[in-house]
Amino acid sequence: MSDMHSLLVAAILGVVEGLTEFLPVSSTGHMIIVGHLLGFEGETAKTFEVVIQLGSILAVVVMFWRRLFGLIGIHFGRPPQHEGEGKGRLTLIHILLGMVPAVVLGLIFHDAIKSLFNPINVMYALVVGGVLLIAAELLKPKEPKAPGLDDMTYRQAFMIGCFQCLALWPGFSRSGATISGGMLMGVSRYAASEFSFLLAVPMMMGATALDLYKSYHFLTAADFPMFAVGFVTAFLVALVAIKTFLQLIKRISFIPFAIYRFIVAAAVYVVFF
């Protein structure tokens, strides 16, 4: 792969990662399809995908830095001082409770989960995840018990963490699982989305660190320009995607995202079978 071609591939995949990582549509499904169409597959491709996820994580940190800073401050007894830090009722305990189920299962079944990274499993996950999105819209309480982040209970945070375990199934979508779970637990669509983004920071950083530790030997100095382009592109696109998504869900339901997932599942079938 020539230098210019590899940089173009990196930019395209960075756009795909940034657009889909935090939408309930499965970034994994999109990366598998696009990577296959571009001829970019194998161990280097898997490591590349892990690295550019860091760009998406950085976008969340930039978008929610006040809230994240506020969570840390509250833990050390510092009251909220800015509107963006919330009212002080969402704490690191909520985040921890949301992390525990998936962390435990992810560590226990890490190798088994990696063996599921193939088109057929991703295709099924896209469909089941789409059904869950529809179920969340149809079965959620008419009036949310937790309209805002600061209204969430520890139980709701833990149950969202349990739903997050579904995202260990490649193609399911971490944001789709957590947001759907939040809505079914009585959290508003917007608050569930915000919590999903906040939860993504420690979860994705931990998962990325573990994957990099296990695959760092596939990295070479020659790969740095390609990885850097993918990282920066994913970061910039994710910034726009997160902001747009949070505005969009104030006006529409998740039904269109579910339908889109079914279309992507059909595309996986056409491309790979």
Curated annotation (Swiss-Prot):
- A single Gene Ontology molecular function, please? undecaprenyl-diphosphatase activity
* Source taxon at top rank: Bacteria
Q: Which reaction does it catalyse?
A: di-trans,octa-cis-undecaprenyl diphosphate + H2O = di-trans,octa-cis-undecaprenyl phosphate + phosphate + H(+)
- Tell me how this protein sits in the membrane: Multi-pass membrane protein
> Which InterPro entries does the entry link to?
UppP
Q: Where in the cell is it found?
A: Cell inner membrane
Question: One Pfam annotation, family name?
Answer: BacA
One CC-aspect GO term: plasma membrane
Q: State the UniProt keywords alphabetically.
A: Antibiotic resistance, Cell inner membrane, Cell membrane, Cell shape, Cell wall biogenesis/degradation, Hydrolase, Membrane, Peptidoglycan synthesis, Transmembrane, Transmembrane helix
Could you mention a single GO BP entry for this protein? Answer: cell wall organization
This molecule's function is given as:
Catalyzes the dephosphorylation of undecaprenyl diphosphate (UPP). Confers resistance to bacitracin.
NCBIfam families, per the entry: PRK00281.1-1, PRK00281.1-2, PRK00281.1-4, undec_PP_bacA
State the remark under miscellaneous.
Bacitracin is thought to be involved in the inhibition of peptidoglycan synthesis by sequestering undecaprenyl diphosphate, thereby reducing the pool of lipid carrier available.
Protein name, entry field = Undecaprenyl-diphosphatase
Species the sequence originates in: Enterobacter sp. (strain 638)
Gene encoding the protein? uppP
